Amino acid sequence: MAKSLTAAELRGYSVKELTEKLKEAKEELFNLRFQAATGQLDNNSRLRIVKREIARIYTVLREHELGIMPLAAEESADKAKEAAE
């Protein structure tokens, strides 16, 4: 992941896309930790950034699960159903 995503940007994704982004972020964190352990990591701050991205993704998924903040992809599907009726 080249750039950090904000929670507002993440809310625009579907649950499937969020789980895919979560998987990618976890893989990146694993690789960064491995590089840090072997002394090959150049940018230590990237570890912190990736951890925060993972936390943001979990937060958005939990908001959706609790119904606090629906995902944008879901809102557009609901509006389409209402318009069809």
UniProtKB/Swiss-Prot annotation:
Query: Its Gene Ontology molecular function terms?
Result: structural constituent of ribosome
Q: Name one GO biological process term.
A: translation
Query: Gene3D superfamilies from the entry?
Result: 1.10.287.310
Short name of one Pfam family for this protein? Ribosomal_L29
Q: Name one GO cellular component term.
A: cytosolic large ribosomal subunit
Q: Does the keyword tRNA processing apply?
A: no
Entry keyword Zinc-finger:
no
Q: Which domain of life is it from?
A: Bacteria
Q: InterPro entries of this UniProt entry?
A: Ribosomal_protein_uL29, Ribosomal_uL29, Ribosomal_uL29_CS, Ribosomal_uL29_sf
Q: Which UniProt keywords apply?
A: Ribonucleoprotein, Ribosomal protein
Q: Which HAMAP family match?
A: Ribosomal_uL29 (MF_00374)
NCBIfam families, per this entry? L29
| Family of the protein in this entry | Belongs to the universal ribosomal protein uL29 family.
* The name this protein goes by in its record: Large ribosomal subunit protein uL29
